[in-house]
Every structure is written in structure tokens, then in C-alpha cells.
Swiss-Prot record:
Highest taxon listed in the record's lineage: Eukaryota
Inducing or repressing factors: Strongly up-regulated by PGN from B.subtilis. Weakly or not expressed in normal conditions. Regulated by the imd/Relish pathway.
Binding-site list for Zn(2+): 54, 164, 172
Cofactor(s) of this protein: Zn(2+)
Name listed for the protein in its UniProt record: Peptidoglycan-recognition protein SB1
Signal peptide bounds: 1-24
């Protein structure tokens, strides 16, 4: 086997593994955490340009499905009540129980980053990530979710990744998580 063929083979193998990884991602539906129906969901047509990463700023995060579902339900209650959003603000929630939960989901406008809501997918990590980064599993789940969004046509191949602090004056998604996402291939300085 010549060098060119070997490189092509390795590249194909890597792409195959990435595709399998994203296809293996299980997204827990809204019904799994007892979501209340959205008041007036707004559809987004076509692929969006941005992924915005957040943290929920819960000091202890969650590690069991019961804890995570309760926290997600509380976030939705806060967003619909105190903040008067039509639904939970995020499109997806990455939780410490090793799962990804559907917030608003794909193809719906979030309420997580003013000026970017109509052109982004908002992903929140449950926990406070000022001093320590999320687990390797949480980080991989977010990467797999982003890959899945691209594969399904909800996210452009040349998307830009931002931390919430790049779209609004806030410390979100925490220094440790922000420093982590700055190493991801689509992160850009704005």
C-alpha cells in the first residue's frame, strides 16, 4: 500500500468513526423530563450558522437522571415564569448523567443569546464550570450533538462556535468550559 492510499484509508476510517459516534448519540425527548408545552414555538428554516455554549450555573450540577430531569424542569419553569420565555431557552441540555436532553430541539428558535437566537443552536451544560470543566462524557456528548446537527442539516458545515460570553456581557459558560471550547475546531474569536 502506498502512502497516498494509506492516508486515504485512515481519513475514511476517522470519518466513519465520527459518523458512528454521532449516530450513537441518544437524545432524551422532552417527555422524558416532563416538559410543559411551549406557548408559541418559532420555526427556523434551513441550517443555522452558530452554536452557542452555556452553563446553567447550578453549583453542584447533577449526576443521576432524577436530579438532571428535576434541574431541567426547574430551568424551564424559571424561563417560562420569571423570564416570560415561551419555553426553556436552550435547544439542548448536556447533563452529568451522561445524557443529552431535548430542550426546544432542532429547527426551533431558542431564547438563549439575544441577536443570535434565530441563527443558532443553544446548548447548555448543567453545572457551574468556572473552575472545572465538564466531564469527558459531557464534552463528547456535546461534540456528538453538534456533528448530528450537521448531519441532519440543521447546522452549516462551516458553523461558528461561541461561548455565551461572546454574545452578551456574562461570565457564562464559566472560565473552565470556555477555555475548553476555545480548543474546538469551529470556535472563533468575535
Amino acid at each position: 500500500m502506498n502512502t497516498s492510499t494509506a492516508i486515504s484509508f485512515v481519513a475514511a476510517l476517522v470519518l466513519c468513526c465520527l459518523a458512528l459516534s454521532a449516530n450513537a448519540l441518544q437524545i432524551e425527548p422532552r417527555s422524558s423530563w416532563g416538559a410543559v408545552s411551549a406557548r408559541s414555538p418559532s420555526r427556523i428554516s434551513g441550517a443555522v450558522d452558530y452554536v452557542i455554549i452555556h452553563h446553567s450555573d447550578n453549583p453542584n450540577g447533577c449526576s443521576t437522571s432524577e436530579q438532571c430531569k428535576r434541574m431541567i424542569k426547574n430551568i424551564q419553569s424559571d424561563h417560562k415564569g420569571r423570564r416570560n420565555f415561551s419555553d426553556i431557552g436552550y435547544n439542548f441540555i448536556v447533563a452529568g448523567d451522561g445524557k443529552v436532553y431535548e430542550g426546544r430541539g432542532f429547527g426551533l428558535q431558542g431564547s438563549h443569546s439575544p441577536n443570535y437566537n434565530r441563527k443558532s443552536i443553544g446548548i447548555v451544560f448543567i453545572g457551574n464550570f468556572e473552575r472545572s470543566a465538564p466531564s469527558a462524557q459531557m464534552l463528547q456528548n456535546a461534540k456528538d450533538l453538534i456533528e448530528l446537527a450537521k448531519q441532519r442539516g440543521y447546522l452549516k458545515d462551516n458553523y461558528t462556535l461561541f461561548g455565551h460570553r461572546q454574545t452578551k456581557a456574562t461570565s457564562c459558560p464559566g472560565d473552565a468550559l470556555y477555555n475548553e471550547i476555545k480548543t474546538w475546531p469551529h470556535w472563533r474569536q468575535n
